Every structure is written in C-alpha cells, then in structure tokens.
Amino acid sequence: MQVRNILKNALFPFSCRVCGQFFHFYETNQGAPVNASAPGGLEALFQCLMAQHLCPVCARQFTAAEPPICTRCGLIFKSRQGEDHLCGDCLESEKPYGMARAAGVHDQSLMTIMHAYKYDGKVQLGGPLSKLLTAVYERHWRPGSIDLVVPVPLYPARLRKRGFNQAYLLVRSWGDVVKRDILQRTRRTAPQTGLGRKERLKNVKGAFSVKAPAAVKNRHILLVDDVYTTGATVRECARILKRCNAAQVDILTVGRAVT
C-alpha cells in the first residue's frame, strides 16, 4: 500500500490551492502534532492538516493567533513584542461577549482555504479546519466550562443555496453540546464582504433572534463562526443572547482579520 501511494503521488502530484504549484505529499514524513501544545504549536498543526492542500511554502505563510493579542476581542497585534492587553477599541467600547479567540490571521493562505471551503463547495476541508478549531478551543476553555456551542446561523434561503452551514460543520463532531436551533436568522442580509465597519453593523442589526430563550438563560455559550472581521455578526448574535439572560457569551472563529 505504501509503495502504491508513493507511485500515485509521483505520477499525480497535488496542486497548491494558493499558488497553483504542483507538489508531492508523503504521509509517512508528516509526523502530525496531536494538538496545539506540541512543538510548533498551531502553525505546525496547520501545516500538517493542510499538507494535501497547500504546498510547504504557502502552508508556512499561516500566522497563528499567538500572543500578544487583545485579552477581550482576540485582535492579533501587528507588533509581536509584549504581553496580552486590551486593544484601543476594547478600551473605548464595551463588548457584549466575554472573549473572542481564533486560530490565526485571515491572510492569503487561510483566506484561500476558507474561500474554497465556504464558496467553492470543498466541504472536505471542513475536517482539517475542524481539527484546527478544536485545538484552539482546548487551549482557551477548560473542559466542561461551556454549556452550549452555538454556530452562527445562515438565512434559510442562503442555506438552501449553499447546502451547508459552514460554522456548524466545523463543530458538529463536538457532540450534544452543539445546538444549531438556538439562534435563527430572521431576515436576509447583504454579504458582509466589501462593506465598511459601520455598514456591517447596520447590515446585521436586528437580523437574528433566539428561538429558545429559556435554553440560554444562565448558560455559558460559545458562539462559533468562520471568520471574525469587524466582529459585527458575532457581536449582534452575542447581544441578543445576553438580552435573553445568557450568563456569558464567548466567540471562537477560524480566522481573525488584522485591522
């Protein structure tokens, strides 16, 4: 079997989703880190998980959400010196959530993978992305500390068109703690891509509702989405969950924009 795989790889190399270059993948040489605490951390884990989708050069372009970051919104500071601290925006404005964390910077390598997963129907990327997200979850939250994991919902028409909720697929293997019927999107919104900060906030204002208010009362909720850009979507979701007396709402995403 090993010889067959080597021959197959030699004859039919993989194509990098970012640069388009062909490359060879040999599974026996990967030595996969089992979690984000292994040597190399999240960056080594990402390179291993994406070894069949990105060439080694592009995989190494991934920047993990490592300190220093904002202790509240998880903003990855451009300066890589110093300790975690509140960013200027979090100092000036209150957030409806406790903390937000992400796997890494939403730059070219991660952005390309996320686009293929979300828009090009490459749902097979959900597996490695889920493992990456799980590693981030295990790093920042204690076992049993989260009562409900709630993926950000899509509007029904958009869900039918896409065929899947990208946020739900990332956490569906987490078991009964995942509840996709807590939140609902009550109106169709324009895509957030291309909108400025104020336009994004206005676009999602009043776009969500809680289907089961009693289910969230006094619960610690982890809200999951694919990317945190300005935070408009997750902030609106967190706001209505808190309005229904959720004890705390935290945020977990794969990507985090650097603004």
Positions of PLM-derived features:
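Glycine-rich phosphate/pyrophosphate-handling loop used in enzymes and phosphotransfer proteins
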Residues: 1-225, 229-259
